Amino acid sequence: MAETKVIYHLDEEETPYLVKVPVPANEIRLRDFKAALGRGHAKYFFKAMDQDFGVVKEEISDDNAKLPCFNGRVVSWLVSSETSQTDSAPPAAEVRPDPPPVPPPVPPPPAERTSGIGDSRPPSFHPNVSGSTEQLDQDNESVISMRRDRVRRRDSTEQGVARGVNGRAERHLSGYESSSTLLTSEIETSICDSEEDDAMSRFSSSTEQSSASRLLKRHRRRRKQRPPRLERTSSFSSVTDSTMSLNIITVTLNMEKYNFLGISIVGQSNERGDGGIYIGSIMKGGAVAADGRIEPGDMLLQVNDINFENMSNDDAVRVLRDIVHKPGPIILTVAKCWDPSPQGYFTLPRNEPIQPIDPAAWVSHSAALSGSFPVYPGSASMSSMTSSTSVTETELSHALPPVSLFSLSVHTDLASVAKVMASPESGLEVRDRMWLKITIPNAFLGSDMVDWLYHHVEGFQDRREARKFASNLLKAGLIRHTVNKITFSEQCYYIFGDLTGCENYMANLSLNDNDGSSGASDQDTLAPLPLPGASPWPLLPTFSYQYPAPHPYSTQPPAYHELSSYSYGMGSAGSQHSEGSRSSGSNRSDGGRGTQKDERSGVVGVGGGESKSGSGSESEYSTRSSIRRIGGGEAGPPSERSTSSRPPLHHPPSVHSYAAPGVPLSYNPMMLMMMPPPPLPPPGACPPSSSVPPGAPPLVRDLASVPPELTASRQSFHMAMGNPSEFFVDVM
């Protein structure tokens, strides 16, 4: 004879019951189910399908109504009438109805539900709650929440039916499995609805006295069903007060499938005692690696039922070793670490060099911040760096407009994109990598860089264009392969190139590409070096720092015709010229000659020596030195203005001095414009001559009297004066 299986849930019990009714599934009615069950005074809900809402719980009270059947089975929920009447109003004293008779095939309810633990009502329903707050601990509440877990997931689809099942509205959990979320949602829907109460109920499993006292002050209110919020899905079901701020998980490992646990532990200790044991590394093939939830850096709190909180490291290791050797599953309770590899919370940038302090740049930068003179964004030398130091990243960040992560596009230069990408807060995963047992520090994967470019740089049509952009970064030397491969691959590790000098690309510009093999290398060079032992700035006074330093600069640069009449005199800085293979690391000065062959922009050196460029050694490019005028009203014959045979003159401290005594200044057209006009020579002064007798001191010459063979220098100086916001350099 055909029979139908009926699965029914009784009240709030976790385990469902099964009864077989000797009636075919398509003909079974409510009276057949009642006859087989032998229970009265109950409400019957059945799983049904609604066209609008899908699966619902439908209440059927007509004995002749057919029961909905799914896959040959009927699913039902029974709510005793006594339970619903008891929950409708708070009783004066706790009344527990006698359990109804249970059919023979149904097992008895669990024994843990006695002595008040299984009571589903909040503490506010108990009249003697003040005397029973000690029983309201987190273990009891965790048991309650876990036993209601499965029933609540089934009872949350329909508001009205759910209210009939357990006496109050339930919340739909949207599939979250956390038991603490279940406990939190139960208290929220039955007690409170405000944000303040939500915060209270969120920690109800660990605040025992406070939760009980707050519940006493509130009346039970029925609330409408509302969707849950995602932020309430944290899981600390039985968190103690000492570890409530940590994310604690419990992992059960089946040791029958794996031969070993597969972890190495690290102990932490200091002068105050042991600080616990942590997961050092995880080995492949072990039980922990197969589970995947435990990571290096997690703190081991408990193994099986043995707590490590008040145990020394040696004892904890011994206990762990003994448990591993025993058969059976192993339960590990660990506290998750916050972040095993922080990307830049309190770490210094990797490419931040330690630079020497330049007081001159400090003073000029302070003046720029105070607004004393305008900062031209196009001039990378506004920081008045000396020729002995290069332009650093810190000063460039003040002189150049910053490039942020949100302003990158395909039109941004490669150096700026690489610099933003190399910053610790860029989001690119840069860390130490292992390749062929070789540690590559601060490396990143090619595919990660392509993804970063595609998501952070605007203008790419597809990912292929971002990959082409990454290939250009490799060709430009801004990123480098470990073995210096020139073709880009997304499966390779890369490191950042030298980004410190990427802003000095103007130094690579050249007006004349000379290779140094012809006589052209003797033309268009700097003024000669000073005599050995002589100060390169004999007329400059001692620098005195004044804070804030006054800068009587004009905001508008003077016209070039005014500058063309200036005389720039007395002083040159030794510099090294390099042009690819040609270098001048060994500058030599022939001090016995008086002719000045090398003149630049009307500038004559102090000494009578001629500077020549050596050959054969590599040297770096050095910046040009700007020239100071003679201050203090020096008006006389040129012979009186020479200083080769007399000590330096002493003048009051000048506010225009940007470098320490004896240190040459960097070549900057803006420095020339910042100086006031020099005094005009008296009418009796002799005009400067282009030829100087041997042994005589050099003369100051006007710009117009420069020989025509120095055309490149004159044109460069004209362009620099006509475009004061740009920086023109002749690379020798």
Curated annotation (Swiss-Prot):
Residues 1-82 form the DIX domain. It comes from the Eukaryota. Transmembrane segments: none annotated. SMART domains: DAX, DEP, PDZ. It is a peripheral membrane protein. GO terms for cellular component: cell surface; ciliary rootlet; cytoplasm; cytoplasmic vesicle; nucleus; plasma membrane. Residues 98-111 have a biased composition (Pro residues). This is Segment polarity protein dishevelled homolog DVL-2. One of its GO terms (molecular function) is ephrin receptor binding. PROSITE patterns: DEP (PS50186), DIX (PS50841), PDZ (PS50106). The lineage of its organism: Eukaryota, Metazoa, Chordata, Craniata, Vertebrata. Involved in at least 2 independent signaling cascades, controlling cell fate via canonical Wnt signaling and cell polarity via a planar cell polarity (PCP) cascade. Acts synergistically with dal/dapple-like to activate Wnt signaling, stabilizing ctnnb1/beta-catenin and leading to dorsal axis formation. Also prevents degradation of ctnnb1/beta-catenin by displacing gsk3 from a complex with ARP/Axin-related protein.
